[in-house]
Structures are given as structure tokens and as C-alpha cells.
Design a protein with these regions (language model features):
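A C-terminal cap/extension of S-adenosyl-L-methionine-dependent methyltransferases
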Residues: 208, 219-274
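Acceptor-substrate binding/catalytic loop of class I
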Residues: 129, 190-204
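A short acidic, Gly/Pro-enriched loop at the edge of an enzyme's catalytic core
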Residues: 109-118
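Conserved class I S-adenosyl-L-methionine
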Residues: 1-54, 57, 61, 151-181
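A short glycine-rich, Lys/Arg-flanked "PGG" loop and its adjoining helix->strand segment in the class I
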Residues: 136-148
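Class I SAM-dependent methyltransferase SAM/SAH-binding core
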Residues: 57-107
């Protein structure tokens, strides 16, 4: 199943680079993630690992902020895309990207204990680990390579948003497929109906995975919030500056509300390595 995920992203690197700028909902995921990272990270330069960082959207942003960043990903396609994109970045970003490496989040043996001041694991990397033992391994590895007291930022794909979207778009054939009920009953999706293999989380399940493996959850955020899965509707509002400004204000107020977190497309956990 790991190979299926790798193969998917090997052929999806171009789309992944543009995914967060393609529509207003993706943009919400991007700006909200960046906001909460910058809320907790110091302004001084620190060393960051961006594991599962794809073609480098967040890694380049962190490098532009002055941090020293290692970008790592399982997908060869994403790594090649990141390397090509880096050539077109500013001198500041180029100098602060320390390495672009191929790595599996369940085994970060190439880095010593406490090698990084902070770690990013964004975009649903943990969701692509179907075996719970692998998810535990991944959290333990994130904890191990991050310094004590350092912040770890992890986002996953929410289960309720996936189920609501299926109903909203009237995906009748997918709803009748056994995979739909597997998602409902907490089992994993094998990727046979599109996208790729995935485990979709409830907020409390995600929180438990983190806390049970030694991380202190400081804050949880619904990255797309009230706009989750409403791409067409959000686009209609996006064209009106005043209306969209009010949507952003509502998002800022409610993105950490427990109900909004649990129904968001992506859920971000801000964790401290206790």
C-alpha cells in the first residue's frame, strides 16, 4: 500500500505544488497553516525538518522566513519537482534549504535524536499510513528527531468532511460502494475509487494518537473550517472582496472551535515535544 501512495504522488507532483493556490478552500488551508506555524515558531532562525513536504510549498516559505530547512518526502516525483523548483527560488531560500532528501516518515534513522528545533508533517502524511502501527512509528519518529520542548506541526485528513462531501456532491456510486462504509466504520480506504490509500481521522482519534505517544497537543485547527468541501460556493464568494473578508473573519473566529475542527477537510495539531 505504501508503494501505491508513492506511485500516486510520483505522478501528482505538479498538481500538488499548485493544489493550495488552485481555489479559495485550498488557499484557506495554506494561509491558516502558515499562520499557526508562525504563531508558535520564534522569529530567530531555527533548524526545521519538513517531512512529507512534497514539492516544497511550506519548506520554501520557512526558508524565506530565515529558518534552516531540510525537505524530505517519500515520493521521488515530489523530490525531483522540489529540486527543480528550488533552482528558481531567491538566493535567501536557496541558502536556507539545507537538503532535499527521500525519506519514509516511519524510519528517519538518517537523523539523530533531537536533530531539529521543530518539525513539520503537513498535508495528510500520517493519513496515508493505513497500519496503525505505522502511524505510531511515525509519531515516535517525529518526537525522536525533534528537540525537547520543540513544536511539531501535524495535519491529517478529516473523516467527517470526506463523508459529507460524498453526500453533498451526490456521489451515488461511491456511496453504494463498500469503501464508503469502510470509511464510516473507521476502516481504511484503499484508493480504488480515486485519490489514494488513506486513513481518515476523527479529531478525538487524532488527539489520542498524539497524546498516547508522548506529544502534548497545544491547539487543534480546522484548516479549511466552515468552507470545507465548498469549493464552488467559496469561489462565488471569493470574487466579492468585502464578502470574502467577512468569511476570513468568521474563519479566524471559528477555525479552532471543536465542531469546526472535526468537520474540516484537514485538521492541524500544534504539538509540543513534552
Amino acid at each position: 500500500m505504501r508503494e501505491r501512495v508513492k506511485k500516486y504522488y510520483d505522478g501528482f507532483s505538479e498538481e500538488e505544488w499548485g493544489r493550495l493556490l488552485r481555489d479559495p478552500v485550498g488557499e484557506l488551508e495554506l494561509i491558516t497553516t502558515k499562520k499557526f506555524i508562525k504563531k508558535y515558531l520564534p522569529k530567530r532562525s531555527i533548524c526545521i525538518l519538513d517531512i512529507g513536504g512534497g514539492p516544497g510549498r511550506y519548506a520554501f516559505d520557512m526558508a524565506n522566513s530565515g529558518h534552516k530547512v531540510i525537505l524530505a518526502d517519500l515520493s521521488t516525483g515530489n523530490i525531483r519537482k522540489a529540486q527543480n523548483l528550488l533552482k528558481r527560488q531567491s538566493k535567501r531560500i536557496k541558502s536556507n534549504i539545507q537538503e532535499i532528501a527521500e525519506a519514509d516518515i516511519t524510519n528517519l534513522k538518517m537523523w539523530r535524536d533531537g536533530a531539529f528545533d521543530s518539525t513539520l508533517c503537513l498535508g495528510g502524511v500520517i493519513s496515508h499510513l493505513l497500519d496503525k502501527k505505522d502511524r505510531v512509528l511515525a509519531i515516535k519518529e517525529l518526537k525522536r528527531v525533534t528537540k525537547k520542548g520543540g513544536y511539531i506541526f501535524i495535519s491529517i485528513i478529516g473523516r467527517l468532511a470526506v463523508l459529507k462531501q460524498e453526500i453533498y456532491v451526490k456521489a451515488l456510486e461511491e456511496i453504494k460502494d463498500p469503501n464508503f462504509m469502510k470509511v464510516v466504520t473507521e476502516e481504511d480506504y484503499d484508493g480504488s475509487l480515486g485519490f489514494t490509500a488513506c486513513h481518515f481521522f476523527l479529531k478525538d482519534e487524532f488527539n489520542g494518537l498524539l497524546e498516547e505517544n508522548g506529544l502534548k497537543v497545544v491547539e487543534m485547527v480546522g484548516l479549511e473550517g466552515l468552507n470545507s468541501f465548498l469549493k464552488k460556493e467559496s469561489m462565488a464568494v471569493y470574487g466579492d472582496k468585502k464578502a470574502w473578508a467577512n468569511i476570513l473573519k468568521a474563519h479566524e473566529i471559528y477555525c479552532t472551535h471543536p465542531s469546526v475542527v472535526d468537520t474540516s477537510d484537514h485538521i492541524l495539531a500544534v504539538c509540543k515535544n513534552a
